[in-house]
Every structure is written in C-alpha cells, then in structure tokens.
Amino acid sequence: MADGKAGEEKPEKPQRAGAAGGPEEEAEKPVKTKTVSSSNGGESSSRSAEKRSAEDEAADLPTKPTKMSKFGFAIGSQTARKASAISIRLGASKPKETVPTLAPKTLSVAAAFNEDEDSEPEEMPPEAKMRMKNIGRDTPTSAGPNSFNKGKHGFSDNQKLWERNIKSHLGNVHDQDN
C-alpha cells in the first residue's frame, strides 16, 4: 500500500559505500512531499487533480522571455541635432539685451503698514507692561544668562539671609527680655 499512494513523490537517494544515510544526509537534499489525506483518496481537499495537472503542464512549458525594448545610444544623430542648436558665428552682431525697467516706487514703508491711519499707540495689558519693566529686585521673571540663583524677589544669598534671620531673632529676643 505504501507504493500505491497518490500524490507522494520520493526522490531516489544514492547510497554511499559506508554511509548510513542518517538525518545529516537527508538534511542536505530537499525532499518534495505533498500532503495526503485518507478521506478523499489521496487528493488534497482544496485542489482537484485536474487543477494540479493543469498547473504541472503550465510549469513544464518553456516560458517566453518578455519582450524588451531596444535601449541604446545613437551618437551620430544626437551630435547633429545639438550642433545646430549651438552655433558660434564670428563677426556677427550681438543681440541687444533689454534692461528691465523698474516701476517707480509709489508706496512708502508707512503706507505699507498703514501708520498714518493708526494715530494712537496700541494699548498693552498691565500684565504685559509689568513683564517688560524691570522692577528692581521684584522682577517676576528670572531668565537670562546672569540670572543664576535669582528668585522672584531678587538674588538669594544664603549667607545674607541667615545673617538677617539671626539679627531679627536676636532683636525679637532682646525686645522680649525688656
């Protein structure tokens, strides 16, 4: 029954003298197998025998090479065309180049930005004015290269703050004693 299975192909293996024909030898050569199902008599359920035979015949036919268009360069014909496009004539008059005339400027910068119509200055909200002014040590923003260790109320010197706190505590203790 093993010889009569339909759809199974076994390639012939040449036996070497002294070779056992182990799994290493089998791994070197690809083996084509097709799945065999016992329910439908050895045929695959998705493909019929007719479809398989048609595909095998199509695979056996030699395929025609695709037609490629000829690709080449015709040097002689191209040089003749380009030579007529560029020609140098000695003693010929040069064509005069026209200088483009510029239109006279009628609009000024003020007219472009409508400065004349807007006579009163823009009003800024007070928050924006506050940010633009430097209010001494009470600057709300501390940004820039020279603003290291600067808080909302100016630069914070920890030594000076410690001295101030000690003096205020001593003053409070001295006042409490009296």
Curated annotation (Swiss-Prot):
Query: What positions are modified (N6-acetyllysine)?
Result: K64, K150, K152
**Example of a GO cellular component annotation carried by this entry:** nucleus
Q: How is it modified after translation?
A: Ubiquitinated; mediated by UHRF2 and leading to its subsequent proteasomal degradation.
InterPro entries assigned: PCNP
Q: Name one GO biological process term.
A: protein ubiquitination
Q: What is its main location?
A: nucleus
Q: Which residues carry this modification: Phosphoserine?
A: S53, S77, S87, S119, S147
Where in the sequence does UniProt note compositional bias of the Basic and acidic residues kind? Answer: 1-15
Which positions bear N-acetylalanine?
Answer: A2
Annotated keywords: Acetylation, Cell cycle, Nucleus, Phosphoprotein, Ubl conjugation
**Chain positions covered by the region annotation Disordered:** 1-82, 134-158
Keyword Phosphoprotein, does the record have it? yes
The PTM Phosphothreonine maps to T139
Start-end of Low complexity biased regions: 37-47
Its subcellular locations are: Nucleus
Which intervals carry biased composition (Polar residues)?
139-149
| Assembly and interaction partners | Interacts with UHRF2/NIRF.
Q: What does this protein do?
A: May be involved in cell cycle regulation.
Q: What is the designated name of this protein?
A: PEST proteolytic signal-containing nuclear protein
- UniProt source species: Mus musculus
Name of the gene encoding the protein in the UniProt record: Pcnp
